[in-house]
């Protein structure tokens, strides 16, 4: 039936054109933003998951930065410890040289004193971001230090942050308040280091940082120093080198662990990025193909609407005739 009030063909063509325009707008939005799920209205479930994953990735990025800072910090302490071991090896060599008959022990002692100053300087200079694990100028012990290691989200949605902990008692070289807390300021019993100890303590310390250990002798020599005393000093220095080596090995292990964790966090961030992309990213090849198809459909829809409107025009001509 032909009516002057209603044009069903035009109405159908108009509805089709509206649907095409809506799809075209959606496709153009995906191409311009790069996302097929940009807001919760697009897909509430995917948007919620992606938003949580992005939040976790931002936290992991902070953890990654903290690990990098921690690695640089431990590298600083390790480098200083390595320098200290080299200087201690020089001190041991000087003491061995002093054991030779006829040498001027006073001159050698001046060299040893300079090397001890280098030890003090190396320990004090091993500071990074306001922390120093080798030198303690405070009254309290440095205690345990923590480095952020990872960010974890459990199955129930709860969040935890784990840390790498290090007891600085293993690395403090100089303690100005309590010499017993520093490897180079504490007293070491030379008698206990002998293969056949006598049971009589002969305590020595290397550096006097302001509070020397009671009942101990500083490692320094002069022409009156006996061969037995030199032997004790060499044994003590050798023991300190062994302790320093163990401490450096521990720092090296911490560095290795941090680097492994840093690599893991970086890989985890990449995996999360890929996961988010699979949920919300638009397939640009698919969307560009759809865009061309919708543009063609839009043109056809406009033509269909134009054709549908010719019915009303034909009725108008009948009345005009």
UniProtKB/Swiss-Prot annotation:
The gene is flaC. Keywords: Bacterial flagellum, Secreted. InterPro entries: Flagellin, Flagellin_C, Flagellin_N. One of its GO terms (cellular component) is bacterial-type flagellum. It comes from Rhizobium meliloti (strain 1021). Flagellin is the subunit protein which polymerizes to form the filaments of bacterial flagella. This is Flagellin C. GO terms for molecular function: structural molecule activity. It comes from the Bacteria. Belongs to the bacterial flagellin family. Pfam families: Flagellin_C, Flagellin_N. The keyword Transport does not apply. Its main location: secreted. It is found in: Secreted; Bacterial flagellum.
């Amino acid at each position: 039936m032909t009516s002057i009030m209603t044009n069903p063909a035009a109405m159908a063509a108009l509805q089709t054109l509206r649907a095409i325009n809506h799809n075209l707008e959606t496709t153009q939005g995906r191409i311009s933003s790069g996302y097929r799920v940009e807001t919760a209205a697009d897909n509430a479930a995917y948007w919620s998951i992606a938003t949580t994953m992005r939040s976790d990735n931002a936290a992991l990025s902070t953890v990654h930065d903290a690990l990098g800072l921690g690695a640089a910090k431990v590298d600083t302490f390790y480098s200083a410890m390595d320098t200290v071991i080299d200087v201690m090896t020089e001190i041991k060599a000087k003491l061995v040289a002093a054991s030779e008959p006829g040498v001027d022990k006073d001159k050698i002692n001046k060299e040893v004193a300079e090397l001890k100053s280098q030890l003090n300087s190396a320990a004090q200079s091993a500071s990074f971001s306001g922390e120093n694990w080798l030198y303690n100028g405070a009254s309290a012990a440095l205690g345990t230090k923590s480095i952020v290691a990872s960010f974890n989200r459990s199955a129930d949605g709860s969040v935890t942050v784990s840390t790498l902990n290090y007891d600085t008692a293993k690395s403090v070289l100089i303690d100005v308040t309590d010499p017993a807390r520093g490897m180079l300021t504490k007293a070491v019993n030379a008698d206990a280091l002998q293969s056949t100890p006598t049971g009589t303590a002969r305590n020595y310390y290397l550096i006097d940082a302001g509070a020397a250990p009671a009942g101990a002798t500083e490692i320094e020599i002069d022409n009156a120093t006996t061969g037995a005393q030199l032997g004790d000093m060499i044994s003590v220095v050798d023991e300190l080198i062994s302790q320093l080596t163990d401490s450096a090995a521990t720092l090296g292990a911490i560095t290795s662990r941090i680097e492994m964790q840093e690599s893991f966090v970086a890989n985890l961030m990449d995996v999360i990025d890929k996961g988010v992309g699979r949920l919300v990213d638009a397939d640009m090849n698919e969307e560009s193909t759809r865009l061309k198809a919708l543009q063609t459909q839009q043109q056809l829809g406009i033509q269909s609407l134009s054709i549908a409107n010719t019915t009303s025009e034909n009725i108008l001509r009948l009345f005009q005739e």
